[in-house]
Amino acid sequence: MALVTVSRSPPASGHSTPVGPTDRVIRRRGRLQRRQSFAVLRGAVLGLQDGGEGNDAAEADPEPMEKPSGEEQPAEDQTDNGQGSQSPWKQVQKRHLHLMVELLRPQDDIRLAAQLEAARPPRLRYLLVVSTGEGLSEEETILLGVDFPDSSSHSCTLGLVLPLWSDTQVYLDGDGGFSVTSGGQSRIFKPVSIQTMWATLQVLHQACEVALGSGLVPGGSALAWATHYQEKLNSDQGCLNEWMAMSDLESFRPPNAEPGQASEQEQMEQAILAELWQVLDASDLDSVTSKEIRQALELRLGCPLQQYRDFIDNQMLLLMAQQDRASRIFPHLYLGSEWNAANLEELQRNRVSHILNMAREIDNFFPERFTYHNVRVWDEESAQLLPHWKETHRFIEDARAQGTRVLVHCKMGVSRSAATVLAYAMKQYGWGLEQALIHVQELRPIVRPNPGFLRQLQTYQGILTASRQSHVWEQKVGVVSPEEPLAPEVSTPLPPLPPEPGGSGEGMVMGQKGSQETPKEELGLRPRINLRGVMRSISLLEPSSEPESTTEAGDLPEVFSSDEEPLHPFSQLSRAKGGQRVCKGPWPALKSRQSVVALHSAALVASRARAFQGQGQGQGQEQRETGTSSTPRLRKVIRQASVDDSREEGKA
């Protein structure tokens, strides 16, 4: 392990420094300058306590202050054996540390810098845990993602900014990876080693506990300084895509090839794809076989394509599916499927500039070419689309105002995206649900939202009707508009709709397919392991300071996420009427259960004490008659009757 100390100065003010600075100027600049020390491990850098403001050093040696402010001063390095020699990886990490510190504001500190696995070497990625001390009562923390083109690079870029709010959760994803969910955003990280992962999770756990205790919620003044870094995002699109990656996607964008680095296989696949269009257009698709298509490609390209048979078949299926073009619902709006979202030629031909992705399992295929807005939901009745329809309406209107067009898609263009287009038509044109459904199904017969989305559309219709008939909501100051999204946990599901009369058989079949796009959801997901529960489990392994105390069942940590039902006997007591939890956090629920258990125990002791007291009086009479003694029994009666005795004394 090596120790690195970085002297940090305030940013340059743009004014020249006097040739002969006075003592007052030196002292002032010395107060602004401070030092931060780091412990350099293999794959991670841990921030140590601040080394102080450096006033004495500034006054004793004014010459270092002649260097331009805003630059990092040379670091003081030490190795484990006290000598100056360092291994190559330590030198690389030292250089990277200096570059990453230069990205920060003077008042912000790096608590941890962890190296992450990169999808495309020789790129390097670092996760920074950054906190600030700018006069805040509570410490605030954000996560930054930093990209290096390679290990020898002398520059780095910023690719991720994730503030840690009170709802931050860390889940272990297996194989050394973990995901951080905060403020509705979820990001995946995978450190390069077990030691790096352990150091990272410890720092993250501490930061999450501080955020939870501080009550940091979006929308207020908390973490306002994070916007400084959000405006500085400057990594290339490939790096941004890697930071935005999700673990449960089913459809992925094709890998981005580095300029001038396409492999021979990629070049051949591009040539096959270019010729495949022409071969399919010139063939009778009702009679031609896959083998004949491959032979025609071999004649055109002049080389055998045996090893590309699976690629050719896959591309043929893709091109066949893309022949089902997106449906033009309005002059500025197309409704389509995953295939339409992946067809770059069709998107450009339709003058699409905005893409509204309503699917949880489908990636953004061309994030560098189009403006995307994502609503990550599954096609299931319990999914909530209503809270997102105000944002989706605004997104579609932005495209129309620019004179371009928007594609709204999900997996098949049947349920999720169709419901969103229906909601847009109802609000934009003042239509009822029935009129909007007739219009959309005429242009795309396979449209059939699942029953849960239809119920939400009915609710949305009532909201729009109330908004049009009364302007009281808009005139009152501070009253939320009736079109504001409803929170999913308080929305009351309407009774199921009766089956619609009529309808084409094709629409019914495709509607069933649309509602079964994700059958794996019905089987239930494996419970995710929460970092907070793991840390509490680890804390229970430490020896207790009170040997006589025992751990009750209610004090055991909840290792798995709150999506699963806890397996303890008093779980039903932590829910309010209607089956909803009173509090999402584990500690209030534990305290509530312990209080209820204590009340039940006191009532049980009191009832048994009265019973024993009655029995003791009866037995005492018998003993006086028979002349026998039962000392142990009398002691037990007196001990258990003490509860009632204390109550009688209180009444007296």
Swiss-Prot record:
What Gene Ontology terms describe what this protein does at the molecular function level?
actin binding; phosphoprotein phosphatase activity; protein serine/threonine phosphatase activity; protein tyrosine phosphatase activity
DEK-C domain residues are: 266-321
Please provide the Gene Ontology terms (biological process) for this protein. Answer: actin cytoskeleton organization; negative regulation of actin filament polymerization
Q: Which domain of life is it from?
A: Eukaryota
Where are stretches of biased composition, namely Basic and acidic residues? 642-652
| EC main group | hydrolase
| Record's subcellular location | Cytoplasm, Cytoskeleton; Nucleus
Q: What else is known?
A: Tyrosine phosphatase activity has not been demonstrated for this protein to date.
Report the PANTHER family cross-referenced here.
Answer: PROTEIN PHOSPHATASE SLINGSHOT HOMOLOG 3, SLINGSHOT PROTEIN PHOSPHATASE HOMOLOG
Give the protein name, as stated in the record: Protein phosphatase Slingshot homolog 3
- The scientific name of the source species is Rattus norvegicus (Rat)
